[in-house]
Curated annotation (Swiss-Prot):
PROSITE patterns: THIOREDOXIN_2. The gene is nxn. One of its GO terms (biological process) is circulatory system development. Keywords: Cytoplasm, Developmental protein, Differentiation, NAD, Nucleus, Oxidoreductase, Wnt signaling pathway. Its EC number is 1.8.1.8. Functions as a redox-dependent negative regulator of the Wnt signaling pathway. It is found in: Cytoplasm, Cytosol; Nucleus. Its main location: cytoplasm. It catalyses: [protein]-dithiol + NAD(+) = [protein]-disulfide + NADH + H(+); [protein]-dithiol + NADP(+) = [protein]-disulfide + NADPH + H(+). Residues 109-309 form the Thioredoxin domain. GO terms for molecular function: thioredoxin-disulfide reductase (NADPH) activity. It comes from Danio rerio. It holds the Pfam family Thioredoxin_8. This is Nucleoredoxin. Belongs to the nucleoredoxin family.
Amino acid sequence: MSEFLVNLLGERLVNGEKAEVDVQALGSRLSLLGLYFGCSLNGPCKQFNASLTEFYSKFKKSSEHKDKLEIVFISSDQDQKQWQDFLQEMQWPALPFKDRHKKMKLWNKYKVTSIPSLVFIDAATGKVVCRNGLLVVRDDPKGLEFPWGPKPFAEVVSGPLLRNNRQTTDSTALEGSYVGVYFSAHWCPPCRSLTRVLVESYRKVKETGQKFEIVFVSADRSEESFTQYFSEMPWLAVPYSDEARRSRLNRLYGIQGIPTLILLDTEGHMITRQGRVEILNDPDCGLFPWHPRPVLELSESNAVQLHEGPCLVLFVDAEEEGELDPAKELIQPIAEKIMAKYKAKEEETPLLFFVAGEDDMSDSLRDYTNLPEAAPLLTILDMSARAKYVKDVEEITPAVVEQFVSGFLAEKLKPEPI
């Protein structure tokens, strides 16, 4: 356990009194670690920091598990004094200010997209236990549900579900169906746009006779808004009044932003968190139930994934439909290998794979990342770290791709700034 945490965090952390904290000694007693991503200049972070301090203080005083949990602050501060001042308000240690490389690795590894964020992980393996610790602090202020591990979807969603004619059905009606858990709200323009597309996709899948259902989990700000929005939807919803169940579903899937569409198989296991991208990329619904594909063709609808972690992008000279197929076939084996390896470990893949042809999206990405115009061009782009890795060779072979990917995952490649 200690060795894993040393690899993850380094040998030393620091606390608000500028004292060092030995990670190996810390790891010898822990079972759960909370990674708290934040910034002193962020208003919501300051508010959450106060709540977390109260939660942490109560837990350490009264919980029978008080020695099994620790929090580590991962800062996005750019000014060391501001970071130090903020750290003095905390009762837990932090990653050293200078250790920016480890900070970015943690952001990428745990798919953090916003702050404040609190991710609880198994201290022995690093596996995510709970992605949305903010809701743990809000909903379980005494820490009675420690260690906040995931529960089966059927258990969390259990209870009556609404139809937009105000009739209800029990959640057991979902048994044996593929399910989309749709986190959305009327006040959010991207949500409303996705809902229009999703209504058509839902209709098309149902017409094929497939057992498919969607459950709307509202983030609306009033029941009136919920009712208005839900009237556009032909599927089911968690009642707006059942705030506790809505919150538990948000916690279960670590929702950090909307719209989010989680797709589940008939056993309630997750197929993908990227239901939004899958739906937009497959208007004919021919790929239902939308299992993740090892290699994607870069498009406007899936470009959002470039900001969710490191991505390998192979740029090629292709303009017509079908011309990208040889490029996809080139990187498919290594993409499948990486996907299978991390699926077996029940971890998210550390690298997504794209091919990009000659179009406006590709041109925009090249311009933004200041890439050469060469084609083919093999790259790994890490937007959150503002770093790129470029393999500019005359011939790109499977061996070249595998060596490039292996070097990146082993941290042997030297990044260039974006």
